[in-house]
């Protein structure tokens, strides 16, 4: 599967069935976000002569942290950044963060956002343009909260939690790149097109996405602006509406 275009050193690496591991590179240093498995990431880094300096974890699910121990065997000094509320489920974290924390990585500020819903301690990482990076793109690593055309299942949270999280992410600058952790765009938009068959924004985007996937390319990253145009979950005006959409999507087998 071909990779999407790289922007500001942010690289998507497709692993397993549909996971996307993001690798953020500057010079010979790399940060990996939600490594599902170790081997393909080790290979990717080695082929480029890169050194792992940190791992960002959005939540505790095995297809997001499964590769971290293997990466640490190779780079034992790498920082593992994760939610303080998930210390028991991500025990190898070395830097525990909370909502509102700001850290500097690879010369850029990174802000931590509490987006609990998919899990009770899910966080996202936002790289704003800010004063020291005005030439760079705003980037969001959002794990399984906001998907391209969808949102994560509610394993530990409520529709109100997800509505709150999505509205918060949706308030980020419209040009912000949405780097989610799964390539679900086509299925999400097929479902959305069934719900809103007369919505040209959704149907037009679906046609583009279908062509992209047929060509063997990824559809990610998306953007906050694109999600406002065609993501029914982000467009939901209440937690009740979001809950109904989520329940319907959970049972959809299209």
From Swiss-Prot:
<dbReference type="GO" id="GO:0017001">
    <property type="term" value="P:antibiotic catabolic process"/>
</dbReference>
<comment type="similarity">
    <text>Belongs to the metallo-beta-lactamase superfamily. Glyoxalase II family.</text>
</comment>
<dbReference type="GO" id="GO:0008270">
    <property type="term" value="F:zinc ion binding"/>
</dbReference>
<dbReference type="InterPro" id="IPR050110">
    <property type="entry name" value="Glyoxalase_II_hydrolase"/>
</dbReference>
<dbReference type="InterPro" id="IPR001018">
    <property type="entry name" value="Beta-lactamase_class-B_CS"/>
</dbReference>
<dbReference type="InterPro" id="IPR032282">
    <property type="entry name" value="HAGH_C"/>
</dbReference>
<keyword id="KW-0862">Zinc</keyword>
<dbReference type="Pfam" id="PF16123">
    <property type="entry name" value="HAGH_C"/>
</dbReference>
<dbReference type="InterPro" id="IPR036866">
    <property type="entry name" value="RibonucZ/Hydroxyglut_hydro"/>
</dbReference>
<feature type="binding site">
    <location>
        <position position="182"/>
    </location>
    <ligand>
        <name>Zn(2+) 2</name>
    </ligand>
</feature>
<dbReference type="Pfam" id="PF00753">
    <property type="entry name" value="Lactamase_B"/>
</dbReference>
<feature type="binding site">
    <location>
        <position position="118"/>
    </location>
    <ligand>
        <name>Zn(2+) 1</name>
    </ligand>
</feature>
<feature type="binding site">
    <location>
        <position position="144"/>
    </location>
    <ligand>
        <name>Zn(2+) 1</name>
    </ligand>
</feature>
<protein>
    <recommendedName>
        <fullName>Hydroxyacylglutathione hydrolase</fullName>
        <ecNumber>3.1.2.6</ecNumber>
    </recommendedName>
</protein>
<comment type="function">
    <text>Thiolesterase that catalyzes the hydrolysis of S-D-lactoyl-glutathione to form glutathione and D-lactic acid.</text>
</comment>
<dbReference type="GO" id="GO:0008800">
    <property type="term" value="F:beta-lactamase activity"/>
</dbReference>
<dbReference type="InterPro" id="IPR035680">
    <property type="entry name" value="Clx_II_MBL"/>
</dbReference>
<feature type="binding site">
    <location>
        <position position="63"/>
    </location>
    <ligand>
        <name>Zn(2+) 2</name>
    </ligand>
</feature>
<keyword id="KW-0479">Metal-binding</keyword>
<feature type="binding site">
    <location>
        <position position="59"/>
    </location>
    <ligand>
        <name>Zn(2+) 1</name>
    </ligand>
</feature>
<feature type="binding site">
    <location>
        <position position="61"/>
    </location>
    <ligand>
        <name>Zn(2+) 1</name>
    </ligand>
</feature>
<dbReference type="GO" id="GO:0019243">
    <property type="term" value="P:methylglyoxal catabolic process to D-lactate via S-lactoyl-glutathione"/>
</dbReference>
<dbReference type="InterPro" id="IPR001279">
    <property type="entry name" value="Metallo-B-lactamas"/>
</dbReference>
<comment type="subunit">
    <text>Monomer.</text>
</comment>
<feature type="binding site">
    <location>
        <position position="64"/>
    </location>
    <ligand>
        <name>Zn(2+) 2</name>
    </ligand>
</feature>
<dbReference type="GO" id="GO:0004416">
    <property type="term" value="F:hydroxyacylglutathione hydrolase activity"/>
</dbReference>
<comment type="pathway">
    <text>Secondary metabolite metabolism; methylglyoxal degradation; (R)-lactate from methylglyoxal: step 2/2.</text>
</comment>
<dbReference type="InterPro" id="IPR017782">
    <property type="entry name" value="Hydroxyacylglutathione_Hdrlase"/>
</dbReference>
<keyword id="KW-0378">Hydrolase</keyword>
<feature type="binding site">
    <location>
        <position position="144"/>
    </location>
    <ligand>
        <name>Zn(2+) 2</name>
    </ligand>
</feature>
């Amino acid at each position: 599967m071909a990779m999407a275009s790289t922007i500001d050193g942010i690289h998507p690496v497709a692993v397993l069935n549909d996971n996307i591991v993001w690798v953020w590179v500057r010079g010979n240093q790399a940060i990996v976000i939600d490594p599902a498995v170790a081997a393909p990431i080790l290979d990717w880094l080695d082929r480029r002569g890169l050194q792992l300096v940190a791992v960002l974890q959005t939540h505790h699910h095995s297809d997001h942290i499964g590769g971290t121990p293997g990466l640490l065997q190779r780079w034992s000094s790498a920082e593992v950044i994760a939610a303080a509320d998930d210390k028991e489920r991500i025990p190898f974290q070395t830097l525990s963060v909370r909502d509102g924390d700001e850290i500097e990585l690879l010369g850029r500020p990174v802000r931590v956002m509490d987006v609990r819903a998919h899990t009770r301690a899910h966080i996202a990482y936002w790289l704003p343009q800010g004063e020291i990076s005005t030439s760079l793109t705003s980037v969001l690593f959002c794990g399984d909260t906001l998907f391209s055309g969808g949102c994560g299942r509610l394993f530990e949270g409520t529709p109100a939690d997800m509505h709150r999280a999505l509205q918060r992410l949706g308030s980020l600058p419209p040009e912000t790149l949405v780097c989610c952790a799964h390539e679900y765009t086509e299925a999400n938009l097929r479902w959305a097109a069934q719900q809103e068959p007369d919505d040209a924004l959704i149907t037009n985007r679906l046609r583009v996405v279908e062509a992209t996937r047929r060509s063997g390319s990824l559809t990610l990253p998306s953007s906050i602006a694109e999600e406002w145009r065609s993501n029914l979950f982000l467009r939901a005006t209440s937690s009740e509406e979001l809950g109904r959409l989520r329940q319907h999507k959970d049972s959809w087998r299209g």
